Amino acid sequence: MAKINDHYLKLKAGYLFPEIGRRVREFAAANPSAKVIRLGIGDVTRPLAPAVIKAFHEAVDDLATTENFAGYGPEQGYDWLINAIIEKSYKPLGVDLKTEEMFISDGSKCDCANILDIFALDNVVAIGDPVYPVYNDTNVMIGRTGEADDKGYYKGIVYMPCTEENGFIPSLPTEKVDIIYLCFPNNPTGTVATKAELKKWVDYAIANDAVIFFDAAYEAFITDPAIPHSIYEIEGAKKCAIEFRSFSKTAGFTGVRCGLVVVPEEVMGTTPTGEKYSFNKLWLRRTTTKFNGASYPVQKAAAAVYSDEGWQQNKEIIDYYMENARIIREGLAAAGLTVYGGVNAPYIWLKTPGGMSSWDFFDKLLNECNVVGTPGSGFGPSGEGFFRLSAFGHRENVIEAVERIKKNLK
């Protein structure tokens, strides 16, 4: 009989968001007349920008003609999309990238998992706590860890607590690690990192021959000009960092699927015999073997994001969500809750009232306010006692949800 990958059996219960979905479905079945407002999972609600829709239609029309038909494209992505991203999103930051250093994908969630293919299992990994669950769970799945302890920490992973005391910015590891996951603006805490803070991590990585996985999925929500959008704004980062970006929140592509990875040619690893080798070459080899490229219509739509018209239209959509974030943040603060995030990020990280557990507060909001959020403990042990709300809802629902919560907490 075929054997399973038993590392999957180490995973704790279900993935966070399916568990939330299960509880909400049970509540809805028992309370069919209740109007449930979902501010939990970070799915967007605004339609795609008109320029993006126009490009989508044109790309579909291309596929209907012999002259413009597009079959298999380059696995790494079309140059016209890669160059548009570099020109519009990186060069204004003072970051110069080669076309060969960027890879277009079908989403950054997959990229954050698949990048592990090109790293040896005996690398020591450091992740924040709380953290986007994909970072943790994918390392468990591939066999890098032992079993989880009573707190939920897996043997073989270095956890870096992100707490109120350290401003939700992890401290440098005291032990040597090989791979460091950083996410800024942060999911789930909504925290951002300054250039000075990121410089510490870059310096650590260079000094310890480590590689930083920098998740910049929410960089488009940064409004403070002093906050870096890319790890490559930091001197030396191209020697030690791989950056992930997503179109899901930047352009509303949660149902379209498109992302990108930047793997600079300078980021090096070592072979078992100690020879240096470029991770860029390995990722290209992995990509050409396991991926046929994002679809032609999707890449055409993504390119429209970087047109002048598409850029402005998407900015207006992002501004809409950030106004939602302001409404949530200020409304809950006025209700006496301690809140973080929601300024340069679309997530609000709040402290549960009265020392309530994260899941108890989830049940309280669902049952008493008919509002769905995300329990902080689902992101890791250090998230216990906290709760995440998303700014991606419809404006009227956001306003109503805040009013319900304020009324309930009086």
From Swiss-Prot:
Pathway named in the protein's UniProt entry: Amino-acid biosynthesis; L-lysine biosynthesis via DAP pathway; LL-2,6-diaminopimelate from (S)-tetrahydrodipicolinate (aminotransferase route): step 1/1
Superkingdom of origin organism: Bacteria
Pfam families to which the protein is assigned, alphabetical: Aminotran_1_2
EC number(s) stated in the UniProt entry for this protein: 2.6.1.83
Binding positions for substrate per the UniProt entry: 15, 42, 109, 132, 187, 292, 388
InterPro entries linked to this entry: Aminotransferase_I/II_large, DapL/ALD1, PyrdxlP-dep_Trfase, PyrdxlP-dep_Trfase_major, PyrdxlP-dep_Trfase_small
Record-listed N6-(pyridoxal phosphate)lysine modification sites: 249
Names of the cofactor(s): pyridoxal 5'-phosphate
GO molecular function, one term: pyridoxal phosphate binding
Catalytic activity: (2S,6S)-2,6-diaminopimelate + 2-oxoglutarate = (S)-2,3,4,5-tetrahydrodipicolinate + L-glutamate + H2O + H(+)
Keyword annotations from UniProtKB, A to Z: Aminotransferase, Pyridoxal phosphate, Transferase
Residue sites binding pyridoxal 5'-phosphate per the record: 72, 108-109, 132, 187, 218, 246-248, 257, 292
Assembly and binders: Homodimer.
Alphabetized HAMAP family for the sequence: DapL_aminotrans_1
Function: Involved in the synthesis of meso-diaminopimelate (m-DAP or DL-DAP), required for both lysine and peptidoglycan biosynthesis. Catalyzes the direct conversion of tetrahydrodipicolinate to LL-diaminopimelate.
Family affiliation: Belongs to the class-I pyridoxal-phosphate-dependent aminotransferase family. LL-diaminopimelate aminotransferase subfamily.
Protein name (Swiss-Prot/TrEMBL): LL-diaminopimelate aminotransferase
Organism, as annotated: Geobacter sulfurreducens (strain ATCC 51573 / DSM 12127 / PCA)
